[in-house]
UniProtKB/Swiss-Prot annotation:
InterPro entries reported in the protein's UniProt record: PA/PA-X (IPR001009), PA/PA-X_sf (IPR038372)
Annotated organism of origin: Influenza A virus (strain A/China:Nanchang/11/1996 H1N1)
Name of this chain's protein: Protein PA-X
Site entry (Important for efficient shutoff activity and nuclear localization), positions: K195, K198, K199
Record: active site: E80, D108
Keywords of the record: Decay of host mRNAs by virus, Eukaryotic host gene expression shutoff by virus, Host cytoplasm, Host gene expression shutoff by virus, Host mRNA suppression by virus, Host nucleus, Host-virus interaction
Gene: PA
Any GO BP: viral translational frameshifting
UniProt-annotated location(s): Host cytoplasm; Host nucleus
Ranges annotated as spanning the membrane: none
Site location (Important for efficient shutoff activity): K202, K203, K206
Length: 252
C-alpha cells in the first residue's frame, strides 16, 4: 500500500502526510490506510482551492495557471497540511483580521469570499452519515461542511456547494480514479471492509514469517503486508508540480 501511495500522489502531498503522522506518533508502515487517507484528504483540499481567486470587485473568479492575473488574491486559505502550531496561528490571524468566530477544532480551509471556515470530508460510506458525524463533532453553524465520496456523491451545509460544478467534478473524478486504481491492485475491498482487512493482514503477516527463509521468493514479490489497505481513517504552495498529481495514477 505504501508503494501505491507514493506512486499515486504528488511527493509534496506525501511529505505533508508523513509529517502529519509523525506529529501524532503514528507509523505509516503499519497504518498504511491512514497514510492513504491523509494523502487523499490533502489532495482534495488542494484541488478545492486550486484556480480560485478574488478580483478587485470581490468576486470569485477561476484563473488557469498560465494566466498573467495569477497574482490575484487566493479565495481559499489552506489550513490543512500545516503543523498544529502554525495552523492555529493562521486561524487566529484570520479571526483577528476578518472577525470570524474561532472554531473549536482546526478546519481545513477558509473562504475569503463567503467569510467562513470549511471542513472537508472524504468518505467511502454514505455521505449523509459522515456529514452528520462531522456536524455532531463540530457543533458549530459557523463552519461550513462539504463531504465527498468515492462514488461521486457529495453533501454540503444547506446544500451550498461553494464551488462551481466543473471544479467539483474534477474532485469527484480524481476520487473515482483513486478508487479504480485501488481496485485494479486488489486494495479496494479491504479498504472498505475493516474486519476483512485486519483478518487478511494477520494472514499475510503469518505467511511472511513462514516464508522468511526463502529470500529468492521474498525479493521477487511485493510484501503481502504492503498490499493490504486497512480501514480508512476519516476524518504551501499552489504549484504546477502539485497540479501534476491530479493526473491518473500510473499503472505498475
Amino acid at each position: 500500500m505504501e508503494d501505491f501511495v507514493r506512486q499515486c500522489f504528488n511527493p509534496m502531498i506525501v511529505e505533508l502526510a508523513e509529517k502529519a503522522m509523525k506529529e501524532y506518533g503514528e507509523d505509516l508502515k503499519i497504518e498504511t490506510n491512514k497514510f492513504a487517507a491523509i494523502c487523499t484528504h490533502l489532495e482534495v483540499c488542494f484541488m478545492y482551492s486550486d484556480f480560485h481567486f478574488i478580483n478587485e470587485q470581490g468576486e470569485s473568479i477561476i484563473v488557469e495557471p498560465e494566466d498573467p492575473n495569477a497574482l490575484l488574491k487566493h479565495r481559499f486559505e489552506i489550513i490543512e497540511g500545516r503543523d498544529r502550531t502554525m495552523a492555529w496561528t493562521v486561524v487566529n490571524s484570520i479571526c483577528n483580521t476578518t472577525g470570524a468566530e474561532k472554531p473549536k477544532f482546526l478546519p481545513d480551509l477558509y473562504d475569503y469570499k463567503e467569510n467562513r471556515f470549511i471542513e472537508i470530508g472524504v468518505t467511502r460510506r454514505e455521505v449523509h452519515i459522515y456529514y452528520l458525524e462531522k456536524a455532531n463533532k463540530i457543533k458549530s453553524e459557523k463552519t461550513h461542511i462539504h463531504i465527498f465520496s468515492f462514488t461521486g456523491e457529495e453533501m454540503a451545509t444547506k446544500a451550498d456547494y461553494t464551488l462551481d460544478e466543473e471544479s467539483r467534478a474534477r474532485i469527484k473524478t480524481r476520487l473515482f480514479t483513486i478508487r479504480q486504481e485501488m481496485a485494479s491492485r486488489g486494495l479496494w475491498d479491504s479498504f472498505v471492509s475493516p474486519k476483512e482487512a485486519k483478518k487478511q493482514l494477520k494472514k499475510d503477516l503469518k505467511s511472511q514469517e513462514q516464508c522468511a527463509g526463502s529470500l529468492t521468493k521474498a525479493f521477487r514479490r511485493t510484501s503481502p503486508a504492503l498490499r493490504i489497505l486497512e480501514p480508512m481513517w476519516m476524518d504551501l504552495n499552489r504549484t504546477a508540480t502539485l497540479r501534476a498529481s491530479f493526473l491518473k495514477c500510473p499503472k505498475k
